[in-house]
């Protein structure tokens, strides 16, 4: 079994490549599997169509503000941008840009509503209704993308998504930047025995030329009572009667699984758990936490699948 910090550890390779094996490229399955994204994008598209069709009819009647056309164009690209980032799983990368563009779009939609809502003409009122829906969806998106991934409302919304992973850290403590700082468990290899200089006296040579203790071959020193290589006296032989004491690990923290996790079959250090399972955790400073399941099974678990209680 590879050690936790070894280069060949499967979990270390997993950390280097990111949490889990996330598929790349554009996929509509990410939108379909995310109820929040599916609902908001669908309502946003419907609101844009209502505003667009009503704007055309209003322009035929005359008196339609030209500013509202720019609002339609701008919101079209905003909705398309949100759709592409969700389908490409790039929300965390572009969430700042998304919030910036949506904030500008909110100004445009509310200004268009103010220009249309007071008109007694039915097409103008229908267009105003479409812009109001666009404003509401924009507010929801700004509140979602403008919040940290560990925010309670965002964690709740993301828990229903099939293809989303949890945030990098679910605790307020800083995350360690070192990928090799993985917690030690009872499965870790026993450290090598250390010897003192007194115990190693028998390995010293009296001649810098020959490699034999007591001098070169045939010398009198070889027949002396000095300890020979591999034949040290009992007083100089390191004792191995004492077995290394097993390190007891305390689990002062409790964490709840917000996602199900299947352990890597190639890494015996990992443990599997189901969503909503309660685990005991020993340390929360790294990206992999030493955890213990209710049945007593111990191992490591990715911190982005857990939230501290």
UniProtKB/Swiss-Prot annotation:
Plasma membrane osmosensor that activates the high osmolarity glycerol (HOG) MAPK signaling pathway in response to high osmolarity. Residues 164-190, 205-244 are annotated as: Disordered. The gene is sho1. This is High osmolarity signaling protein sho1. The chain crosses the membrane at residues 37-57, 67-87, 96-116, 126-146. It holds the Pfam family SH3_1. Residues 58-66, 117-125 are extracellular. Residues 250-309 form the SH3 domain. Belongs to the SHO1 family. It comes from Pyrenophora teres f. teres (strain 0-1). Forms homooligomers. Residues 1-36, 88-95, 147-309 are cytoplasmic. It comes from the Eukaryota. It is found in: Cell membrane. Keywords: Cell membrane, Membrane, SH3 domain, Stress response, Transmembrane, Transmembrane helix. Its main location: membrane. Residues 169-190 have a biased composition (Polar residues).
């Amino acid at each position: 079994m590879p050690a936790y910090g070894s280069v060949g550890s499967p979990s270390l390779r997993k950390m280097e490549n990111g949490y889990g094996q996330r598929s790349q490229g554009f996929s509509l399955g990410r939108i379909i599997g995310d109820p929040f994204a599916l609902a908001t994008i669908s309502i946003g598209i419907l609101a844009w169509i209502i505003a667009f069709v009503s704007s055309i009819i209003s322009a035929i009647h005359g008196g339609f503000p030209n500013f509202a056309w720019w609002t339609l164009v701008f919101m079209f690209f905003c909705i398309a941008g949100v759709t592409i980032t969700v389908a490409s799983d790039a929300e965390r990368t572009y969430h700042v840009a998304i919030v910036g563009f949506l904030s500008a779009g909110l100004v445009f939609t509310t200004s268009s509503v103010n220009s249309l809502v007071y008109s007694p003409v039915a097409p103008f009122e229908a267009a105003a209704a479409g812009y109001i829906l666009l404003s509401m969806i924009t507010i929801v998106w700004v509140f979602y993308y403008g919040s940290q991934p560990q925010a309670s409302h965002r964690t709740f919304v993301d828990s229903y998504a099939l293809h989303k992973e949890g945030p990098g850290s679910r605790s307020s403590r800083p995350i360690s930047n070192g990928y090799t700082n993985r917690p030690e468990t009872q499965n870790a290899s026993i450290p090598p025995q250390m010897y003192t200089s007194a115990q190693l006296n028998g390995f010293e040579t009296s001649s810098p030329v020959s490699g034999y203790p007591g001098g070169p071959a045939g010398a009198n020193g070889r027949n002396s009572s000095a300890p020979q290589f591999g034949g040290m006296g009992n007083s100089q032989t390191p004792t191995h009667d004492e077995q290394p004491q097993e390190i007891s690990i305390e689990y002062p923290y409790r964490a709840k699984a917000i996602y199900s996790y299947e352990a890597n079959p190639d890494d015996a250090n990992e443990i599997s758990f189901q969503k909503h399972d309660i685990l005991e955790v020993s340390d929360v400073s790294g990206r992999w936490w030493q955890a213990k399941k209710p049945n007593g099974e111990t191992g490591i678990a990715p911190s982005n699948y857990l939230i501290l209680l």
